[in-house]
């Protein structure tokens, strides 16, 4: 199934994992779809829930999507803006990029956010200790070709249509409050920052936050999926052993292309943590019948399954 790509990119975006995550979701549009760590929003955008709360601690992400919801940003206005700024970028190169970055850090205009997100280095979304966007230029002055602008405006158009059709709310909030608001029948999708990776002003993340998140998820009446990483060739995620023994874990190998650090470009075994068993009795029987060789050849496999609900 074709994945609907969001207009804002960010490191760790789950575009290539969205269908895999969606396939293991039991959300049936009866409750509210809740994302405490919206980021790009790609998973929720592909679920297309009737009711959703997309939350993030980064106000610039929330302001951008509220600008689409409130029709400040439309496909037409985004096209016009990117054509204008793209022409200036092609003419003046990095000087124009840094001029827009300076302007954004003063005015925080969501149009500038879109431009910077698509013109910066590798689509990284990073803010310094003062809360200012500080990603360098991506060194592609010809970035905003006609086809590329059309691609972005179509992405804006999808979100605009979805916010007209569905009850989607974009809120700037801490994950504690968002998860605590969930009720039975709701579905939570969590994509928190990874410890030690992509840390900045808005997404610093450590052991304490990781523990608090899992404690909240252990007690929520809602079903959830949490995206995390399991291991790479250097190390294993210690949180998997510490906090997930109550839950089901599925894994899949994935390769991230975002990040300047070569160490962060290695293949990684991604994991999703669930508080339910997504496999049917038939699936479980087939799982038992797989040979060891077949298991190794499978793209995803069940590590262990002891769901709490």
Go through each PLM region and give its residues.
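SAM-dependent nucleic-acid methyltransferase catalytic core
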Residues: 2-27, 71-189, 193-198
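Conserved S-adenosyl-L-methionine
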Residues: 18, 24-86
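Short glycine/proline-enriched coil/turn segments at helix->beta-strand junctions
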Residues: 26-30, 47-51, 182-186, 218-223, ...
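Short, solvent-exposed loop/turn segments at secondary-structure junctions
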Residues: 40-43, 58-61, 119-122, 175-178, ...
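Conserved beta-strand scaffold positions in the cores of enzyme catalytic domains, especially
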Residues: 52-54, 170, 246-251
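The conserved SAM/SAH-binding core of class I Rossmann-like methyltransferase domains
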Residues: 55, 173, 227
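Glycine/threonine-rich flexible loop motifs
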Residues: 198-204
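Long, positively charged, glycine-interspersed low-complexity recognition regions
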Residues: 206-309
């Amino acid at each position: 199934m074709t994945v609907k790509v969001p207009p804002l990119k960010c490191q760790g975006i789950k575009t290539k994992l969205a269908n895999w995550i969606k396939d293991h979701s039991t959300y049936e549009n009866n409750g509210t779809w809740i994302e405490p760590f919206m980021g790009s929003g790609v998973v929720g955008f592909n679920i297309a829930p009737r009711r959703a709360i997309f939350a993030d601690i980064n106000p610039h992400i929330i302001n951008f999507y509220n600008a689409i919801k409130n029709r400040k940003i439309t496909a037409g206005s985004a096209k016009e803006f990117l054509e204008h700024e793209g022409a200036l970028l092609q003419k003046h190169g990095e000087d124009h990029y840094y001029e827009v970055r300076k302007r954004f850090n003063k005015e925080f205009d969501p149009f500038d956010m879109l431009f910077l997100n698509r013109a910066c280095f590798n689509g990284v979304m990073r803010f310094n200790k003062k809360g200012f966007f500080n990603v360098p230029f991506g060194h592609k002055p010809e970035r905003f070709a006609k086809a590329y602008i059309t691609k972005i405006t179509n992405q804006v158009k999808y979100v605009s249509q979805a916010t007209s059709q569905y009850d989607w709310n974009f809120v700037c909030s801490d994950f504690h409050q968002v998860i605590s608001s969930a009720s039975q029948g709701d579905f939570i999708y969590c994509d928190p920052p990874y410890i030690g990776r992509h840390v900045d002003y808005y997404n610093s993340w450590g052991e304490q936050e990781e523990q608090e998140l899992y404690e909240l998820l252990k007690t929520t009446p809602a079903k959830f999926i949490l995206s995390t990483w399991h291991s790479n060739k250097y190390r294993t995620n210690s949180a998997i052993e510490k906090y997930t023994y109550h839950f089901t874990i599925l894994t899949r190998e994935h390769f991230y292309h975002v990040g300047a650090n070569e160490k962060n470009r290695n293949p990684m075994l991604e994991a999703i943590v669930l508080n339910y068993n997504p496999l049917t009795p038939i699936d479980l029987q087939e799982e038992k019948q797989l040979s060891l060789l077949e298991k190794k050849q499978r793209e995803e496999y069940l590590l262990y399954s002891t769901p709490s609900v």
